[in-house]
């Protein structure tokens, strides 16, 4: 008999949550325009909208807040953050930002010029938007398996080397300022990249003089998957695997609101001094002094402490296994989800869940709204709404993946909460034929998934 295991932490403080009535939730989602982003958090029972900034900090992180140096310039909290990034990630230079998209903004302004192409292993919403705002064009060079929810490839986040080289041949290396490799790949279902693939991408970049950049937002989860799945890494600590992963990159953008276990903050890290200088020039305009980048000193202290906590092997094993616990319950019930189960979330396959709803009636959006009405669980659409429109044609981008993301915050919920979520999804699966499509009645010009509004189709 296998010995049971428990969360590798004790709970010191709690926040009450409440279940509401179905009638209350029907009114709430109607007032929110059937967009879960527009719900009030007090009306949500279990909040799986995102793992960004919604994590529980440790007592050490709360203690670190009191150590924050709030000096306007040269705060010692910056140097503690810099030391943590150098020690754990291995990059020479660090520029703090208010969150990940602040770092995306900086590197896009520094490296991208109009007419450039930026290859990557699947798009991410804010990343692509910043690239397009600078006149660049994102090109997806992820392996084909990433677009198949049922493909069992252990590293579905891998870059397709042939696609990458074909792009270089087509547009020329001088039109490619860098390749952006996400670790893990959010839009593919939290899927990892193998160490072997990172080495191959590095070789191509070196051959053609192209920089290799990382969106390292969930790189620790990626490192854990390498430990589990890639030969030669089973006995290595996650901390060591992460350091090797980062050694292949010239720099990274980072949202500290995920891996680093904080509520706000991010950074841009790099090895080239000229990029550091440009970043410092830009951060003063858009974020603040280069030693705070829009953050309070206390936030930099909490990020630094979180960087050390995130590479604890017991912590990251629990984090991955809690996500897996939910996903395996759904698989046992025959519910279509992205496989293998990813690092930060379970992704429902809305196409397979609601085959009667065409993609231009937003099946993932409809499923997320239905889940909230059923149980008060808030999830996120990751399909055609998130994909936005083609900036040249104005037509919808039609992604192959139409998903609902059940994103699990770190150290916040217990497995009993996961049982409630699983029960609700199973109930909806039985009632799936009653779910109707939606029409969009308000659409903002960019990042529409945040604030768009919908209504049911009769």
From Swiss-Prot:
Thermostable. Its EC number is 4.1.99.2. Belongs to the beta-eliminating lyase family. It comes from Symbiobacterium thermophilum (strain DSM 24528 / JCM 14929 / IAM 14863 / T). The lineage of its organism: Bacteria, Bacillati, Bacillota, Clostridia, Eubacteriales. It holds the Pfam family Beta_elim_lyase. HAMAP family: Tyr_phenol_lyase (MF_00543). Its cofactor is pyridoxal 5'-phosphate. One of its GO terms (molecular function) is tyrosine phenol-lyase activity. The keyword Cytoplasm does not apply. One of its GO terms (biological process) is tyrosine metabolic process. The modification N6-(pyridoxal phosphate)lysine is found at residue 258. Keywords: Lyase, Pyridoxal phosphate. InterPro entries: ArAA_b-elim_lyase/Thr_aldolase, Beta-eliminating_lyase, PyrdxlP-dep_Trfase, PyrdxlP-dep_Trfase_major, PyrdxlP-dep_Trfase_small, Tryptophanase_CS, Tyr_phenol_ly. This is Tyrosine phenol-lyase. Homotetramer. It catalyses: L-tyrosine + H2O = phenol + pyruvate + NH4(+).
